Structures are given as structure tokens and as C-alpha cells.
């Protein structure tokens, strides 16, 4: 794919961007990207989504689009070329990168199973609650709410587990739009961002996630959704 590099005089027009080939930038979601995913075009056709702060290498500009090589996070997309309309690239990339590189999440059981009413699900759920501490803040989570014999799920086993980068939209199997829409605009952002968990002693996604909601199928599900 031939691309060009705008190295002429600086463009001072409002909303403009000067494309610098070889520059590293990071993805940024717009206010309208409420779920937390930014739609990008794939080289060769089709589209995909990336989350905030994905590391991108600027390849250049062609026909009103800015092209990037994905350098981080989305394992299935690393090394691939994606593009944005030039006017969107103004809003959808930034140079600073993430302020915090990593975080440790410590989860501690808070007693045994209890039945609690969920205002979102409008019914009683049998929950295994825990407290998740992240950056000094304590957040209520549920580790399971669907039990045998009706279901085969169970709480995550104790251990030191790795939190992986978000993989894809989970709207189909676990739409969380209702939680976001229950609060004033802007209270909950990126509700569709799920973080896979690599269990201690295993490799790759265990199909357990850190995500928000009131129903857990063995995930670390953030019950205090507004936090």
C-alpha cells in the first residue's frame, strides 16, 4: 500500500492534523463511542474495533485516510494495517499514551453465597461477593451468580492471575448497555470493554473476564457498576 508523508508547511486550520510518517500515537475514543470501541478500517477490506490507548505506528496518508500499523494490545491485530478518515484521526489519536502502565487487582472473598436483589435484573440472584481493591479503591464484585445443577459455572480459583488486554466486543453474549443507560450520561464509559483473565499455570484467555454487570458466569464482575 503506497502512502505519502505530509512534510510540507504546518497546517494551522482548526481540526486539521499533520501526518508524520513513523510517529507513534495512541488510539482515543470519541464521546459517541460510548461502548469503548473505536471502529477502524482494515487494509484489504472490512472493519474491526480497537480500544483506547492502543499503540499505533503512523504509516502515512492516502486519499483522505491516515494509515497505522497496530503495535500493541489486540493480539489478533498486532502488525496489521488499519486506517481512519483524516478528520477522525484528529479526534481518535493522541501522542501522550496511557498515564498508568499497569495495575494490580486484589480480590478478597466477603463471606459465602448470599441471595440479593438486583435492581438491574429485577430479581433475586445467588451471589458470591468479593471486594476488589485497585489503586486503593475497594469495589464490590461478584464471582459467580449461576450455580450447579442448573449451570456449570464456579468462582475463579484463588491464585495470582494475569489480566490481559481487552479482546473484542461482548455485546452478543453479555450486553451491558442497560447498566450504562441507567445512569446520567458520562457516568459509565467503556461498558463493553472486557478484560480476559489468564489463570495462574495456564496460557491465554481462560474465558473468564473482568467486566461490569450484576450477573457473573465465573467472571470477576464489577457489581458496583457506576465505579
Residue ranges and their predicted role:
Residues 223:
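A short, glycine/acidic-enriched catalytic loop
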Residues 2-217, 226:
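Cell wall/extracellular polymer interaction/catalysis modules
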Amino acid at each position: 500500500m503506497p502512502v505519502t508523508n505530509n512534510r510540507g508547511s504546518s497546517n494551522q486550520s482548526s481540526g486539521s492534523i499533520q501526518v508524520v510518517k513513523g510517529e507513534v500515537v495512541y488510539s482515543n475514543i470519541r464521546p459517541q463511542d460510548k461502548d469503548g470501541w473505536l471502529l477502524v478500517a482494515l487494509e484489504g477490506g472490512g472493519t474491526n474495533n480497537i480500544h483506547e490507548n492502543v499503540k499505533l505506528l503512523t504509516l502515512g496518508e492516502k486519499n483522505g485516510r491516515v494509515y497505522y500499523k497496530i503495535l500493541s494490545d489486540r493480539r489478533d491485530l498486532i502488525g496489521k494495517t488499519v486506517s481512519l478518515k483524516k478528520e477522525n484521526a484528529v479526534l481518535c489519536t493522541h501522542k501522550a499514551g496511557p498515564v498508568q502502565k499497569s495495575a494490580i487487582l486484589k480480590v478478597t472473598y466477603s463471606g459465602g453465597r448470599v441471595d440479593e436483589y438486583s435492581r438491574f435484573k429485577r430479581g433475586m440472584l445467588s451471589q458470591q461477593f468479593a471486594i476488589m481493591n485497585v489503586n486503593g479503591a475497594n469495589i464490590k464484585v461478584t464471582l459467580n451468580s449461576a450455580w450447579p445443577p442448573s449451570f456449570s459455572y464456579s468462582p475463579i480459583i484463588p491464585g495470582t492471575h494475569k489480566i490481559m488486554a481487552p479482546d473484542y466486543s461482548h455485546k452478543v453474549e453479555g450486553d451491558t448497555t442497560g447498566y450504562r443507560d441507567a445512569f446520567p450520561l458520562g457516568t459509565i464509559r467503556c461498558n463493553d470493554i472486557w478484560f480476559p483473565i489468564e489463570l495462574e499455570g495456564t496460557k491465554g484467555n481462560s474465558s473468564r473476564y473482568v467486566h461490569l454487570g450484576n450477573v457473573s458466569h465465573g467472571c470477576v464482575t464489577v457489581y458496583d457498576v457506576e465505579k
